[in-house]
Amino acid sequence: MRWLVFWVLSALPVLAEGEKAGEFDYYVLSLSWSPNWCATTGDARGSEQCETRHDYGWILHGLWPQFHQGWPAYCRTPHSAPSRRMTREMEDIQGSAGLAWHQWKKHGTCSGLSAADYFALSRKAYDQITRPAVFRKLDRSVKLPASVVEEAFLKANPDLEPDMLTITCRDGYIEEARVCLSKDLNPVPCGRDVIRDCRLEGAVFDPIR
């Protein structure tokens, strides 16, 4: 029985809080389709990100330091927290200053970088991945296989291989595209605990608001 419990626990993703900053294996760049997040979460919160004046599509959820199994979080760091100006300057790609702050606190502290350098690296990673333009052309909600979203990203980014990208779903909606990158932001294969491809054949994909 004890061996069974050990096996089950060892198979679960590992969250290592309070790890030393800068000690990790690679990054996960997480891109969220804003209209779908608004439909499942943001509207209920009254999030400003979901107002039509913003025209958000694929936004940066975060750049996450990752182990080959598990991930660090809320690390000890000698660097100061970001200023309000720094987090506001990330709104154009992250949707809100609040998200930028949370991402620094949970993930940025584990990068070993200052807040300014972490945000700069996050922006660089976001900019180097081409977000497929086809999704911005939708004029109505559609249902599609999650594999179609993955194929669109692979076509738009020839340097990516299928094992370097995963598409996630939540509550029947396409949720995120997650790309695995080295510390130098070169595409790398994802760990087994990151590859969780959505298998839905009819995932909802909402248009830009």
What residues fall within each predicted segment?
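C-terminal, well-folded lobe of enzymatic/effector domains
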Residues: 21, 82-83, 92-209
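Hydrophobic h-region of N-terminal signal peptides that target proteins for export
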Residues: 7-17
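Sec-dependent signal peptide recognition
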Residues: 1-7
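Betabetaalpha-Me/HNH-type nuclease active-site subdomain
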Residues: 18-96
